[in-house]
Amino acid sequence: MTMSGTAEEALRREYVIGEEIGRGRFGTVRRCYAAATGEPFALKTTPKAALRELEADPLDLALAEQEPKVHLLASAASRHVVALHAAFEDADAVHLVLDLCPGGDLFALVSARGPLPEPEAAGLVAQLADALAGCHRRGVAHRDVKPDNLLFDASGALRLGDFGSADWFGDGRPLTGLVGTPYYVAPEVVAGKEYTEKVDVWSAGVVLYMMLSGTVPFSGATAGDIFQAVLRGNVRFPPRAFAAVSPEAKDLMRRMLCKDVWRRLSAEQVLRHPWIVTRGGSVAVN
């Protein structure tokens, strides 16, 4: 993939572009290095041409163009957010220079190891909730929390990445739009309603369920079937997968996967839940 003119020139003055290390729906992620120091980073490039095609959703282009600003705001939210170090943008593409997270992602971890022990899962959820609480305090909703977007840095700490679906909220401005991933999206999003930042807590609840069982709570043969299961919102804990899971962990999942948004926990409340505090240890809020 070739990068765009002026943005590419500015980028290449400061960074040496390396090999491709990932690919998303619209763009690629490459390794890059600071020209002055040799420090490694990840470079996410989103070309705008595909987002301007007739059949493309205009929301996708709008989100790509605002991603640098939203991600910059989120970068200061928590040490568990993948930091944005530089952004280069012109009419053709958006290039983001990000923390390099060489430890893979949570989806790969659970795929390789199967269900995680409760203390480990609690520690990871604490880190995720810290990232979300920080973002929410700054008026940023991620809107695509899923294991693929939860990365591990060189020290093994969890980092929330990919703010390509993120948006601002607050001051009476509701969130709208069907964004996210079917297995992890909250029912109020599927229903086409206005919604709040608590959609991220629902998604984090699905992530916790997946960490403890190796499966997801809402599934189906098609995206439509999955959405119907999400709308029903019946959270079950099959004995085969959850026989060894504690009542406290199940209580937290029920509170995160609560269809009633007003009763659903906030990210801050997740951090204070007894299962997180006693098994995962509390994470210092930045």
Model-derived regions, located:
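Conserved N-lobe ATP-binding subsite of Hanks-type protein kinase domains
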Residues: 28
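Conserved N-lobe beta3->alphaC-helix segment of eukaryotic protein kinase catalytic domains
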Residues: 46-74
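A conserved loop-to-beta-strand element in the N-lobe of protein kinase catalytic cores
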Residues: 82, 91-99, 107-108
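Activation-segment/catalytic-loop signature of the eukaryotic protein kinase fold
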Residues: 87
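Activation segment signature within eukaryotic-like protein kinase domains
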Residues: 124-125
